[in-house]
Amino acid sequence: MHFHERFDVIVVGGGHAGTEAALAAARMGSKTLLLTHNIDTLGQMSCNPAIGGIGKGHLVKEIDALGGAMAIATDYAGIQFRTLNSSKGPAVRATRAQADRALYRQKIQNILQNQANLRIFQQAVDDLIVENDRVVGVVTQMGLAFESPAIVLTTGTFLSGKIHIGLENYSGGRAGDPPAIALANRLRELPIRVGRLKTGTPPRIDANTIDFSQMAEQKGDSPLPVMSFMGDVSHHPKQISCWITHTNEKTHEIIRGGLDRSPMYSGVIEGIGPRYCPSIEDKIHRFSDKSSHQIFIEPEGLNTTEIYPNGISTSLPFDVQLNLVRSIKGMENAEIVRPGYAIEYDYFDPRDLKNSLETKTINGLFFAGQINGTTGYEEAAAQGLLAGMNASLQVQGKDAWCPRRDEAYLGVLVDDLSTLGTKEPYRMFTSRAEYRLLLREDNADIRLTAKGRELGLVDDIRWAAFSEKLESIELELQRLRAQWVHPNSPLIHALNPHLNTPISREASFEELLRRPEMDYSKLMQIEGFGPGLEDPLAAEQVQIQVKYSGYIQRQQEEINKAVRNENTGLPLHLDYKEVPGLSNEVIAKLNSHKPETIGQASRISGVTPAAISILLVHLKKRGLLRKSA
């Protein structure tokens, strides 16, 4: 049975990757269908109720700069906002928001329902229709076929999902949802390498049974940050506190005593878990010298008593979970309302993807999110936006696009995955980026919004606001460079008290701002130097561009040298055995990875600079050198 309409792009799955993929394709004018097994759970925060953080907040800002929904929804749902690393340099500062699950889901669903060119249909997908190595549609659980030349799979943890609590396990996509068994079996038939990964979640606690007076209160920031470049503090709901407590030796003894019934330590779980978000039993085992681990007590919303104890993800049996929770200060009488669990699921080797997130072997088939081996809402959403965008570009007959490593954390994420692959759930950190001084949260719009506009992702309202901000920054930078003060100027009397050493020669306002003791706000408050910019985001941009100009210029010079390799494409079907002079190890690795550019090839472990030189000579001789898209 065939559905009566044909679609340009079909997105399978309605989590963070799927919603951004569907919205991106629809914004670009493609007739888009979002298929989900349950419309009510679109935009669901399946694990921790938070968005952003180190590296992750940078991705959220980039999604926002490209017109995505995550940051906007967070501003409407965030019940506590904090800027992490606020005392450090701008490259590593990151925004994190505690979110109300219900408000976040509602806002995402509202955005989806009001997006032009987007249809939503409730049905699980069981099969792909593939003809001559090209996907042409999908078949749902009830045998209904939908036709489309571009399919984006964002299946999360649902592919052959198996939930573990102690030594008991059962099939599930997440607690309360069925797994996607038929689709997983179909995907295993494709010529793409498959593996198993694991993630987990902590037990949820009834707030009415917690003694918060025994814990340290953690308040949000004041003034309140916003997540979206289009956001406003007035969008935020009521703000509340989180709390901090710790495990202790008794907690650790309880956990050690339950390890014989842990699915992780009894060999029941095959999949590898996230290194940077380990279960509490893994922490106790790996860091046996530590007598205590920090736990963040995070409310799940304004109208629920459920608490998310961040730091005690576990798949131990329920009785052990209850005992370990009650051993923690402030939770001696706590009641669990939902048990913690681990979930195993299929993922596919991202080295089998192009950097557009299209599979190398099946034309028109795109993967995004946990199916590619990543962990985290933000990583999934960023991939979803990119996959949905490239699916739309393909349907329109246009070249695919992915930012380079020096242009966005999204570029770092995709390059790491498609070049190096992953054996464990991949999460983003600022340390993964070589050029992080240029890849800051504050300049994500300056880096990406113009490209988003060119691609059709950015609407008129966002573009007008961005253009106005950009113009104000440029005009203010010009003013600071053009205006000067000299030692005999009348302005000196107001200025000198704010300087560590009085000026002895003529100096521009820009040079004054570059002094370590001076900041933009202080300079603008001195008589004769203001009034300056009213927009705090534009003012911040002026200050960073002035104070870090030397470092930024040096990093840009490094990038300019590296870009040549990034833009030199490699034929995907090149057999590296035909390249004389390459070692057997290099041949094997290049044939396995099938890099798309010389830059990607150079980052594969074991591929030496000498091998790259040999490869370039071979390609040039045979006229195979080309610029990548």
Swiss-Prot record:
Give the location in the cell. Answer: Cytoplasm
The entry's NAD(+)-binding residues are 273-287
Q: Which GO terms describe its cellular component?
A: cytosol
SUPFAM superfamilies, per database record = FAD/NAD(P)-binding domain
What's the main place this protein lives? cytoplasm
Q: Which Pfam families match?
A: GIDA, GIDA_C_1st, SAM_GIDA_C
Record-level Gene Ontology MF annotations: flavin adenine dinucleotide binding
TM spans (from-to): none
State the source organism's domain of life: Bacteria
Offer one example of a GO biological process linked to this entry: tRNA wobble uridine modification
Q: Which residues bind FAD?
A: 13-18
Which cofactor is essential here? FAD
This protein's UniProt keywords: Cytoplasm, FAD, Flavoprotein, NAD, tRNA processing
Check the record and name the InterPro entries matching this protein. FAD/NAD-bd_sf, GIDA_C_N, MnmG, MnmG-rel, MnmG-rel_CS, MnmG_C, MnmG_C_subdom, MnmG_C_subdom_sf
Xref: NCBIfam families? mnmG_gidA (TIGR00136)
How is the quaternary structure described?
Homodimer. Heterotetramer of two MnmE and two MnmG subunits.
What's the stated role of this polypeptide?
NAD-binding protein involved in the addition of a carboxymethylaminomethyl (cmnm) group at the wobble position (U34) of certain tRNAs, forming tRNA-cmnm(5)s(2)U34.
Q: Which family does it belong to?
A: Belongs to the MnmG family.
HAMAP family in the record, alphabetically?
A: MnmG_GidA
Q: What is this protein called?
A: tRNA uridine 5-carboxymethylaminomethyl modification enzyme MnmG
Q: Which organism is it from?
A: Shewanella sp. (strain W3-18-1)
